[in-house]
Amino acid sequence: MFLKRLDVIGFKSFAERISVDFVKGVTAVVGPNGSGKSNITDAIRWVLGEQSARSLRGGKMEDIIFAGSDSRKRLNLAEVTLTLDNDDHFLPIDFHEVSVTRRVYRSGESEFLINNQPCRLKDIIDLFMDSGLGKEAFSIISQGKVEEILSSKAEDRRSIFEEAAGVLKYKTRKKKAENKLFETQDNLNRVEDILHELEGQVEPLKIQASIAKDYLEKKKELEHVEIALTAYDIEELHGKWSTLKEKVQMAKEEELAESSAISAKEAKIEDTRDKIQALDESVDELQQVLLVTSEELEKLEGRKEVLKERKKNAVQNQEQLEEAIVQFQQKETVLKEELSKQEAVFETLQAEVKQLRAQVKEKQQALSLHNENVEEKIEQLKSDYFELLNSQASIRNELQLLDDQMSQSAVTLQRLADNNEKHLQERHDISARKAACETEFARIEQEIHSQVGAYRDMQTKYEQKKRQYEKNESALYQAYQYVQQARSKKDMLETMQGDFSGFYQGVKEVLKAKERLGGIRGAVLELISTEQKYETAIEIALGASAQHVVTDDEQSARKAIQYLKQNSFGRATFLPLSVIRDRQLQSRDAETAARHSSFLGVASELVTFDPAYRSVIQNLLGTVLITEDLKGANELAKLLGHRYRIVTLEGDVVNPGGSMTGGAVKKKNNSLLGRSRELEDVTKRLAEMEEKTALLEQEVKTLKHSIQDMEKKLADLRETGEGLRLKQQDVKGQLYELQVAEKNINTHLELYDQEKSALSESDEERKVRKRKLEEELSAVSEKMKQLEEDIDRLTKQKQTQSSTKESLSNELTELKIAAAKKEQACKGEEDNLARLKKELTETELALKEAKEDLSFLTSEMSSSTSGEEKLEEAAKHKLNDKTKTIELIALRRDQRIKLQHGLDTYERELKEMKRLYKQKTTLLKDEEVKLGRMEVELDNLLQYLREEYSLSFEGAKEKYQLETDPEEARKRVKLIKLAIEELGTVNLGSIDEFERVNERYKFLSEQKEDLTEAKNTLFQVIEEMDEEMTKRFNDTFVQIRSHFDQVFRSLFGGGRAELRLTDPNDLLHSGVEIIAQPPGKKLQNLNLLSGGERALTAIALLFSILKVRPVPFCVLDEVEAALDEANVFRFAQYLKKYSSDTQFIVITHRKGTMEEADVLYGVTMQESGVSKVISVKLEETKEFVQ
């Protein structure tokens, strides 16, 4: 392959399109300074992929576009096309001619083409990689590059040798692999972060989903058992309710009948009482009749005696009466005449008295001034006298009233005394009955006290047993709960182990089909075990390889892989025992690690496994070290040169090379590695708990039977006690009634004492009052007598007034005397008139009585015999009536006694009926309350079915049948509710959420496995490339070093030169030092040589590289500028010598170089800022040289 042509337009100073055709051999490009000849080199470098504007002697990529001149506008495009002959297929492309084009626009856009086909810059770089023709290759040495090679650091100088060794593609691939590794690690980190986050979700969600499923199962079971039990309870309760309702209905009917009987009895008692009252009233009436009859009989007897006496004096009385009648008639006539006369005289006297009174009034007015005081006193005394006179009359009337009241009080006292005697007898009877009741009550009370003591003792024992039972039952339910939890955990672990939960999908499917596939030993983590404290470290050390599947051989692995592909089950990594070889620490490193205090052991030594799997375990864990902590891991890694992977107990990792991985490790409830151990522990604990639970069940059963026996005994004691209490209540009721009756009688007796006392006190007060009134009457009489004397005294005093009044007084006196006389006469006449009238009236009355007596006497005398007989007959009749009345009273009293006995019987019967009625009513109320509670309970149960399960009783009974004993069912319901309560808050959405998150977790786990495998593969690739680069670099370096000394001697005409590695132990990073000893000088570093010597040494290095690694073409830009003529000549000869194998394009202005050139191109700048290329013939070149 060789360079055929370069086409340029718009690149730097090439404003117009130029084409440079290259031939084999040496092509020289010449021109004055500043003409733009080095732009040819820049154009080639740029089209081969250079991206640094500074390497192209610009500030930014826009600077390579023609910027214009005084006469030309700037261009907006720079384009370079490089055409190469590829007949020998030096370039890895199936074309005989390859053209590479690169364009850049002022807008910043770029275009890349290979054979006019758009491509990427990366494609161009890859095309020339490790061909020696790249942008950084030793085949293109621009201005200053020689000096840069000589003066650069030994490490930077290494790139020339790497290019020569052809390791750039490996280096690039390594870089890509490292980038891919970093990208993979980033992806792995992201996946692990997401997995870490998902692990924080998956495990809780898994637990929540398991709890939710458990909850739904328990809820379903609870629903079935509870509905069936509720339906059973409803049916049982309804049967009891129906029976009780019939009983209550019968009791109501009995109550109604007894109520009617009580009403009838009360009516009979009321009727009897009415009859007794009627008899009492009848006796009272008969006694009144008896009294009247007795009185009439006594009158008749008296009249009989009077008749006998009158009969004796009848004649004598008749004569006397006749004489008296005559006298009375005569007297009547005389009195009538006198009365007529006297009335006329009285009228005359009245007129005179009236006249005298008028005169007296006149005189009194005249005398009033003289005797006013005396008159007033007299008048006052008269007023007092009249008041005393009124008081005297009032006192006499009150004395009469007191006499009447004292008579009435005596009658009342006698009646009260009779009643009191009766009440005393009744109280005596009641006291006897009361004493008997009290004795009976005390006996029952003692018996009740004994029963209560026995009941309390039994109750205490019962409560102790009940507390012990409840305690044991609570412990049993707790044990059930623990057993249930342990069994659930065991089932979960067995299910997870059976389902290979937590394994990658591909691994899981292989393990499930392990028997069918054959040759499958199991996943790595299934084949090992370790102590719990090492589990985290071992899991981290294994990483994804923990789920690698161990097979007998490669054929088994291929069969499993084919199975995964056919069923699209994912991927898995297999470890055939037939090919896996163990790895282990070097003995020296093992000894070094053992001496470190933090070192715990090699991972393979900390796990237990079958010796058959030693190669696999040693391969995976034989070079992994386990330490206490990260600090110790760092120290140990440094001691071992960061060649091994070190894991701490907390899961932190120090990787080979020094990188570190660490942070928080999520604590899993059951890791894959520790699952078997945990299952074994749970199984052991479950067996122990089940044994303890069985013992508790037996204890609870025994206690329950004991409690039931005690409950029966307590019920018997309660029943006996209730019977005694009812009997006691009955006696207490009787005692209460007797106490009430006794209290009533005592009240009557107290009332009698009070009434008697009150009456006695009233009589005594009346007597006192009477004596006082008599004394007052005597005092009033004395006062009246005194007042009369005072009036007489004052009257006499008034008569002894002074002489000035005497005349008037005499006149007045005379007038008064005359008036008094007239008045006295008038009074006398009036009295006479009244006397005559009275006497006339009395005479008329006496005359009438005398006539009547005479008529009666005459009648009696004429019928004395018949009258006496009539009276005798009347007396007999009255006596007969009296006898009948007495007999009738006795009969009524006998009837009353009989009725009273009947009433007492009725009342006792009524009392017993009421007592029994009250008991039945109380029982009926209790039964009704119980019935009401049953109805409420039935309604609650039916409502519970409707509201909780939307079921009717018929639907529940039809769909759900009670399959066990009701008590067992209740126990089961309680256990299920306890289990549900123990589950706490249940997230039912966790089931779907777990499926979603777990699916993603599985997918990402597979991604992690793939990324881990890719990471391991990349590590392996990098390791392989490191080995290849080390080998290639070392081989190439040795060859170049050998040729360098030879070429140096040839160019310098002697001396010697040497290439040295700065770090022979690190061929991947070691720098290269150039040591030169020109002829006649000491061996010394390049920095101590002259400029020419340095340039010639660099040229010697270039030719040494070309000897080892020939390239199709080489571009040299004034590399010999610093050489003298002799060295330029030697340089030109070497160019010519090597031009048979390598095409040289030389940018130069040295004659010796030009002389050896096959073709010359000249670059001129005829127009300011614009370069042009012209071809120069060889003859013209020679002339130009001469």
Swiss-Prot record:
One of its GO terms (cellular component) is cytoplasm. SMART domains: SMC_hinge. It is found in: Cytoplasm. ATP binds at P32, N33, G34, S35, G36, K37, S38, N39. Its main location: cytoplasm. Disruption phenotype: Mutants produce anucleate cells and show defects in nucleoid structure and in chromosome partitioning. GO terms for molecular function: ATP binding; ATP hydrolysis activity; DNA binding; identical protein binding. One of its GO terms (biological process) is chromosome segregation. Keywords: ATP-binding, Coiled coil, Cytoplasm, DNA-binding, Nucleotide-binding. Residues 519-637 form the SMC hinge domain. Residues 167-206, 259-481, 672-864, 893-943, 990-1029 form a coiled coil. Belongs to the SMC family. Contains large globular domains required for ATP hydrolysis at each terminus and a third globular domain forming a flexible SMC hinge near the middle of the molecule. These domains are separated by coiled-coil structures. Required for chromosome condensation and partitioning. Homodimer. This is Chromosome partition protein Smc. It comes from Bacillus subtilis (strain 168). The gene is smc.
